[in-house]
Structures are given as C-alpha cells and as structure tokens.
C-alpha cells in the first residue's frame, strides 16, 4: 500500500490565521497530540523570526516523540550573505531539529520584484542554501513557493528552480500553490510536468483561497505526491490551508492509501476539537468528517433510510474518524427521527402508536412557533415524557416577580421572588443576581434545594438569546438556549416567548426538571404525590405564566 507522508504546519502556517495565537504551552500540547495522531512531520515555526518559536524547539528537545519528526522553517539565504554566515540559515541549524524546511522563489515576478536579483542569482540562493543545510546533517525539505503561478508565467524557469534544489540534495521538493488560486486541472498538469523534470520525491502545499485546498491536495496525491502539507481544521492565513482532517480521511478512506493508519484515524475528530479549543475557536459544525453536523440527519425520509441502511445517506461509518451519527428533531422530522432520538436517549415508543404521532405533531407545532431542539435535547426528553408517559413535574409554580434596579452611577442589580409548591408545601424565596435571569436562576434553585438537594450542584454554564423576528423591535419573539451542568453531565434546554424573562424561565424549568427526572425518575399523572405541575406541553407555551412576572 502506498504511503503518503503527512506534514503538519498548524503551529506555523496555521497560527498565521486571523484570531489565532498559540502560547508556548499550547504549542507543546499540540506537538504531543499530533505525534499521537501519527503525522510524520511537525513544523514548529520559524526560529529566525521570533523567540517563542526558538524556545519551542528548545523545549521539544526534552519531549520524546513516538512517530513525528520536528521541522524548523525558514527561507533561502539572503542575497547579501553567504550561506554559512546567513543568520536565518544558522538559526535553522541551531534549532537542532532533524528536519529543516526552507522556501525559495519559483516565480520570476517574485525574484525580480521581491528579491530584486537576477534569475540566475536566485538559482544560486536555492543551491547554496540546500547544500549548506545538507552539510550540517539535516533532512532538507524544499518548498517551491508560488510554483504553480511561476509555472504559468515561465514554466522553464519554475522547473529550473526545482532542478537547482534537487542538484543540491533536497530530500523532498514541495510544490506550493501559495496564493491558493489554482484549479485542480492545472494542479494536475503542472505537478505531472514537475515529476517528469526531477526525480526527487514531490510533495504538495495548497491554500484555500479558491475553496480548492483539499481538492488540489488530493489531485496532487493522485498524480504522485508523496507528501501533503497542511493544517488541522484548515487554519491559516487569509482563507486558510488545506485541511488535514479532510486530506487524511480522504487518503485513508477514499484513495486506498496509507497516511496515519486506520487505527489512528479514529482520533481525528478528537484532535480536531482539541486544537480548536487551544486556538480558542469554536469548532466548525459543518466541517467534513469531524464536524458535529457531518453525520447529522434532519429530514424524516433520510432518517428512515439511515435506520435501514446507513450507507443510504452516509458516505462512511462515522466511527472510522471518531465521529458519531446524530438525528435532529425539527419541523422536518418524521416518526423515524422521533424513534431514533428516543432510542438514543433510552426512551421507548412504538412507531405505529398514537403517541408517536402526538409527539411529531407537537414538535412541528412548537418548531413553527420558534422552538428548536438542536442543542436542547434535554427539553426534548422532558417534552417526550410529558406527552408519551404523561408525567408531571415535581414542583408547581404559583408565580414569580423579577425587578431590576439602578441607582445613580452604580451597577444595576436584579432581584427575583418566586413562590412555588412541592407536594403541597409552599416555598416563597428571593434571590439577587447580576441580571434578571441570574436572579431567577438562583431563586429557583434556592427554593428547591431544601426538597431536592441534588440540584445544589447544578449551574448555568451558557446562555444564548436569538431574536426570531427582528421586525418586531422590542416586542420581537426570542429563543433562549441554556446549557446547564452538574459537574458530571451537561445538558441544553430551550424557551421561546415575546418576553425574554418568560423564555428564560421556560428553559430554566426544563433544566431543573431534567435533572430531577434523572435523580428521582418521572412522576406519572395520578400518582399519590401528584398535586400539581409546573407547566404543561405547550404550543409555544401560550398558557405559561403570562401573569407570573412583572
């Protein structure tokens, strides 16, 4: 089986992406994670340009890598220096990495305008730089910057630069689509021409400015590339680099070649999300292979087909890349969605039962009103129990009042007063918070903790508001998504109303109800302890606490 080397440049090219800044500690964590994934090369940075990268190379000397080889990055020598006195080349040697990657000019435009030298002088820079690094015992990877644009402008000269690197002893020559503007047909033609001109193993380095980064990398592999350079999640300058998550999966699962191996491939989703976290960026849900939505199904017909044969709407088994199938509940849902989602959460229902139709109809009614259960699956489970098992909540709300007050130049504060009943016992509680929702959340938990100590550890960890009809101005309908956690599990709930506090209350009630259900089990209607309920299933909760707040 043909092996394709994976060269990761997340720490150098990836960190040039907007809003990305890895700390030294972040970079060390990423090095270890990439090594575990099984990539062949990890480009740590440019030691000649900043102290952080130089320190990284010093730190990685103490890290035992199981698979990957560290690479330092730089350029060919400066025209005014000889190779042995060039500060950049000497910094590469002093980085003490087994591999050094340098880039040189392949496009005559850059030679004449950026470097301001003759074409022959540029060939000397390439030869002498590669030869110098080789003489210091380095594995030298030569990146032919702007090769594809250079080929278009002057193919003979572009090929001559490759020959210069080969003659000096480069181990690998990487053809770079630095501007990211080349189409796949041109990538293939120009790659093949290069492979006929030099015998050194060739690699590919593509950018995504034309949304072709991954496609161009794969075309080059099919044309014979032995190495692919890219970044995890496609991070990089401008529109980013070739996304290695997609490249690796395509090599392993589509081309029948080897890169990191099938076993390591199962780590791909985890590594993608891990590096997103360190980059302080939200993972792209629609990212191929590793995104949360990559194997998410919403349409009822699709879900029905997937339940019978996964290949009907999935091009691979999600588990192969460490991902998982998801079925979404929405107004597009049919009974198949409900059955799958119910089974996924350990809930039982017969497809042909009247209850299944009731759930589907209620969901469609609520989604039409503005509810959305993607990311609020705890609300779905609470609703399911109310409709199918006819459960009641463990507490009944008599009413609440929320007041926000500001005095002078001081910070505003909010106070919530709640009156509710648990098994007939009345609880009247007040709490303050930094805002009305915070106060309401604290008051609700404070009033219930005496009866249900298990909610003492429940915390609101995320709160999102979306305006559903902005043309309504201050009377617009809003959807509130809340994420809660007890330290062991996290769950999401939803509420919708023209009143922000009411929408928040709905989501808070579902959050507490979900936790109590997990701890105490559902309460059926008519049970001895069944005195009342907090709120019934709602078509937008039109009946819910309209007069219970001010």
Where are these regions (language model features)?
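Catalytic alpha/beta core domains of metabolic enzymes, predominantly
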Residues: 179-182, 188-308
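Mixed-charge, glycine-accented linear interaction segment located at domain edges/termini
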Residues: 487-524
């Amino acid at each position: 089986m043909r092996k394709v080397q994976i060269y990761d440049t997340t720490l150098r090219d990836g960190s040039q992406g907007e809003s990305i800044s890895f700390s030294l500690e972040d970079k060390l964590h990423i090095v270890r994670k990439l090594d575990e994934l099984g990539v062949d090369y990890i480009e740590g940075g440019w030691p000649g340009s900043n102290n952080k990268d130089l320190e990284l190379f010093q730190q990685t000397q103490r890290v035992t890598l199981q698979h990957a080889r560290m690479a330092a990055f730089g350029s060919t020598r400066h025209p005014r220096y000889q190779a042995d006195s060039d500060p950049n080349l000497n910094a590469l040697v002093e980085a003490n990495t087994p591999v050094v990657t340098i880039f040189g000019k392949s496009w005559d435009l850059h030679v004449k305008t950026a470097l301001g030298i003759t074409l022959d002088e540029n060939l000397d820079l390439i030869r002498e730089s590669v030869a110098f690094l080789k003489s210091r015992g380095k594995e030298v990877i030569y990146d032919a910057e702007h090769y594809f644009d250079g080929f278009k402008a002057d193919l003979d000269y572009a090929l001559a630069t490759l020959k210069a690197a080969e003659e000096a002893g480069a181990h690998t020559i990487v053809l770079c689509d630095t501007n990211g503007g080349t189409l796949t047909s041109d990538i293939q033609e120009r790659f093949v021409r290069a492979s006929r001109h030099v015998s050194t193993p060739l690699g590919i380095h593509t950018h995504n400015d034309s949304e072709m980064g991954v496609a161009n990398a794969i075309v080059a592999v099919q044309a014979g590339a032995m190495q692919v350079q890219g970044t995890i999640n496609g991070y990089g300058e401008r529109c980013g680099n070739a996304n290695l998550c997609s490249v690796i999966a395509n090599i392993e699962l589509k081309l029948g070649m080897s890169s990191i191996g099938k076993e390591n491939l199962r780590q791909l989703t985890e590594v993608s999300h891990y590096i997103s976290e360190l980059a302080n960026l939200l993972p792209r849900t629609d990212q191929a292979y590793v995104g949360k939505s990559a194997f998410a199904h919403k349409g009822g017909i699709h879900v029905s087909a997937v339940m019978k044969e996964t290949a009907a709407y999935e091009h691979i088994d999600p588990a192969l890349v460490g991902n998982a199938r998801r079925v979404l509940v929405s107004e597009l849902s049919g009974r198949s969605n409900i059955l799958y989602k119910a089974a996924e959460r350990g809930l039982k229902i017969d497809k042909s039962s009247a209850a299944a139709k009731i759930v589907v109809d209620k969901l469609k009614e609520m989604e039409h009103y503005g509810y959305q259960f993607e990311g609020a699956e705890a609300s779905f489970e609470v609703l399911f129990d109310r409709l199918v098992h006819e459960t009641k909540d463990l507490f009944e709300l008599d009413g609440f009042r929320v007041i926000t007050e500001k005095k002078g130049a001081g910070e505003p504060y909010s106070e919530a007063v709640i009156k509710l009943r648990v098994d007939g016992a009345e609880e009247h509680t007040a709490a303050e918070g930094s805002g009305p929702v915070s106060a309401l959340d604290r008051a609700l938990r404070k009033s219930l903790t005496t009866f249900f100590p298990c909610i003492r550890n429940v915390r609101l960890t995320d709160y999102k508001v979306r305006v559903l009809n902005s043309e309504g101005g201050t009377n617009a309908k809003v959807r509130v998504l809340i994420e809660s956690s007890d330290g062991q599990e996290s769950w999401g709930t939803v509420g919708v109303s023209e009143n922000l506090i009411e929408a928040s209350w709905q989501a808070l009630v579902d959050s507490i109800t979900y936790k109590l259900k997990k701890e105490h089990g559902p309460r059926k209607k008519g049970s001895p302890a069944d005195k009342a309920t907090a709120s019934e299933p709602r078509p937008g909760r039109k009946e819910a606490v309209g007069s219970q707040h001010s």
